[in-house]
């Protein structure tokens, strides 16, 4: 069987208005690949967090004028999503060390502010890598557990 790959690229302004467009595109890409509802919802949350972080932090010095690039690579058993910007970078390891682990008994009023998006992204996706060379690039992978829909080989003629 021949392996099938598709690649979809989006460029959107760094504005919160475009998060819903990206989520809709993601839903279509994941549905077409046969992903489960839960996988689609997990990926939508993770991508929303990553894009919102880029909108909120990457271009704050430039009055949020900038571009966010989104790539979907559909492979046989997984979908790789890459979100990148050319804005201000941050120290991923330092931020990550400040955000967790969370204690389930911790009073919600005293939870640390910030960084929860990174925690969610890592919790919901199967693989996450952050690069910070010129801007920030987040690469996320979700392994696809295909919906179990049987192919019905028997066809019934209806006249």
Curated annotation (Swiss-Prot):
Catalytic activity: L-seryl-[protein] + ATP = O-phospho-L-seryl-[protein] + ADP + H(+); L-threonyl-[protein] + ATP = O-phospho-L-threonyl-[protein] + ADP + H(+)
GO biological process, one term: negative regulation of DNA-templated transcription
UniProt KW Nucleotide-binding keyword: yes
Lineage, top ranks: Bacteria, Bacillati, Bacillota, Bacilli, Bacillales
PANTHER family: ANTI-SIGMA-F FACTOR RSBW-RELATED, SERINE-PROTEIN KINASE RSBW
Summary of the function given for this chain in its UniProt record: Negative regulator of sigma-B activity. Phosphorylates and inactivates its specific antagonist protein, RsbV. Upon phosphorylation of RsbV, RsbW is released and binds to sigma-B, thereby blocking its ability to form an RNA polymerase holoenzyme (E-sigma-B).
Official protein name in the record: Serine-protein kinase RsbW
Keywords associated with the record: ATP-binding, Kinase, Nucleotide-binding, Serine/threonine-protein kinase, Transferase
């Amino acid at each position: 069987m021949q392996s099938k790959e598709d690649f979809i690229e989006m460029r959107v302004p760094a504005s919160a208005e475009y998060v819903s467009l990206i989520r809709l595109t993601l839903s279509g890409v994941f549905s077409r690949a046969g992903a489960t509802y839960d996988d689609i919802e997990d990926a939508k949350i993770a991508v929303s967090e990553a894009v919102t972080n880029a909108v909120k932090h990457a271009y704050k010095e430039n009055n949020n004028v900038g571009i966010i690039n989104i790539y979907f690579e559909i492979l046989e058993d997984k979908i790789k999503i890459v979100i990148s910007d050319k804005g201000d970078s941050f120290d991923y390891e330092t931020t990550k060390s400040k955000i967790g682990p969370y204690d389930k008994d911790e009073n919600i009023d005293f939870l640390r502010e910030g960084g929860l998006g990174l925690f969610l992204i890592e919790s919901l996706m199967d693989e996450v890598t952050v690069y910070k060379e010129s801007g920030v690039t987040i690469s996320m992978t979700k392994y696809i557990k295909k919906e179990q829909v049987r192919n019905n080989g028997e066809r019934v003629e209806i006249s």
